[in-house]
Amino acid sequence: MFENQQQLLRLHGCKLFIIGENDNLVNKYGHSVAIACCYDPQGMSVRVFREGSQQQLEEYPVSVKTTHLNHGITSHILIVGGEMIYVKFASEEDCQSFRMLLQNMSGKVNSVFNLRTEDSSASQYFQFYGYLSQQQNMMQDFVRTSTYQRAIYSNSQDFHNKIVLDVGAGSGILSFFAVQAGAAKVYAVEASNMAQYAQQLVLSNNLDGKIIVIAGKIEEIELPEMVDIIISEPMGYMLYNERMLETYLHGKKWLRPEGKMFPSRGDLHVAPFTDEALYMEQYNKANFWMQTEFHGVNLVALRDAAMKEYFRQPIVDTFDIRICMAKSIRHTTNFLTADEKDLHRIQIDVEFHILETGTCHGLAFWFDVEFAGSCSQVWLSTAPTESLTHWYQVRCLLQTPIFVKQGQVLSGKVVLAANQRQSYDVEMDLKLEGTMITSTNTLDLKNPYFRYTGAPVPAPPGSNTTSPSEAYWGQLDAQGARNAVNLVNGITVNGLGEVDMTMINTNLMPIGNQPNIHPGLISSTGRQQSQQQTTPAQPLTMNPTIACAATSTQNVAQQQLIGGAISPSLFTTPTQQIINSHHAQPIHGAQFY
């Protein structure tokens, strides 16, 4: 049971004392208490309960950095939050069990995860994924969730009567898919406090014999047996952000020979792009610091630092693929054969054959992952040509753009250097072949700029090959001819019907063109209450309109930038929320909260 895994140790008949200034002991509660030592992502939580009751009196967070001392054979001292706590156990055996737990926790300080991760980053990371609202955001990404479901269902042969490991299980949704596909048993490993919610879902769905929730990091837990297949959703921005892929690969120590991994491989695509508006947007932000009389203060000394800071931010949004100036370069990672150390420094050599003349403002990134099953191959894509996901696409600007001509070759390299903040420094070094022109930049993938607003993605300037005005009026004329209507300045004559002036090439976004995001049946983070009457839920293919109230009062923009960003469905119009269409374009006029 999960309680036994979450609750590492429970001891009765304990007494807690506070050590005063004169080293005198003061019984904190005046009676015996029970102590429960429970799993926590940062170590463990020591919880104090009234004896014979579930009433919790106190909770002390204990990490590998917590100072603690042995005192005799039945007592131990903890120093937590500046307070010295003297714990007297009922027996020598109980005290030894408690000390053994502390030793085991200290031994985990050198786990692979802890060695590569700052404490502050890990704390923020696990806190983020411990919120139901964040799990909901990912689950409501229709493309993400449904692709995983399709990949598992269509390869049920790989799951039938198999032992499955779900790495970073979160809510456990992938574990449920595996059981539905016939898995004999699923070990759902989750390091955040979401593990307790996953266990609640397992119990309420009567699957406690099929799905075993294990609270802990895959680098630190032990499994009772080897597994046949590993499932996970470890992708971040630009595929590698969050460094969860390393945890996914680490899980292979439990994988049987010839076992499978879902996903099986990941492709990171890189392409040069042109976008003068985006470049000037970032450039002009830094020009704030060009003021010489800002409330009597000269700010110019900080302008260069501000410019560097803005251009160190990767841009998270979506774009028209026609801004790409060359075919994308693909960097592939085979998860079945790759080692986690291979992801510590990723170098991608690039050679772009320019297809059109213009200014290259930087490099665009997106990724695809493949589920290579025995029966079918399924792909999940975040390409700008596909339905929008909560990963969007990422663009990295050059502070000094390069003017390129059709037929020229732009070469160089992109290096992703892993850091202890569970992210990467992105180093770009580009050179225009046959010239002395070069441009470099280093960006901080941990600090992206989430630019997507929900507005329609405009076509690149100069995309029209015919007159849009003539095409618009020509289609109106054709419509009028079909309806046998005589028009005078758009007004019907002789009562012969009307021409719809809004149906062709307007700047208004059709209601049906919304991101392909499944809303589920509950309210969503960041969503506004619809003022529009809704109809009962219908099948997915019916494109239902669902009104939901926000479930979180936190700043959604800040919440969503650790993993993927806000699901596109959570962008709202002032009067309505339309979701689950077959297109990847957002609602016109939507606002971001």
UniProtKB/Swiss-Prot annotation:
Keyword hit for Ligase: no
Record Gene3D superfamilies: Hnrnp arginine n-methyltransferase1, Vaccinia Virus protein VP39
Post-translational modification: The dimethylated protein is the major form.
Domain SAM-dependent MTase PRMT-type: start-end pairs: 122-429
Keywords, sorted A to Z: Chromatin regulator, Cytoplasm, Methylation, Methyltransferase, Nucleus, S-adenosyl-L-methionine, Transcription, Transcription regulation, Transferase
InterPro entries in the record: Arg_MeTrfase (IPR025799), PRMT_dom (IPR055135), SAM-dependent_MTases_sf (IPR029063)
Residues modified to Asymmetric dimethylarginine: 482
Pfam families, sorted: PrmA, PRMT_C
Compartment(s) of residence: Cytoplasm; Nucleus
Record's subunit section: Homodimer.
Record-given protein name: Histone-arginine methyltransferase CARMER
Organism of this sequence: Aedes aegypti (Yellowfever mosquito)
Lineage of source species: Eukaryota, Metazoa, Ecdysozoa, Arthropoda, Hexapoda
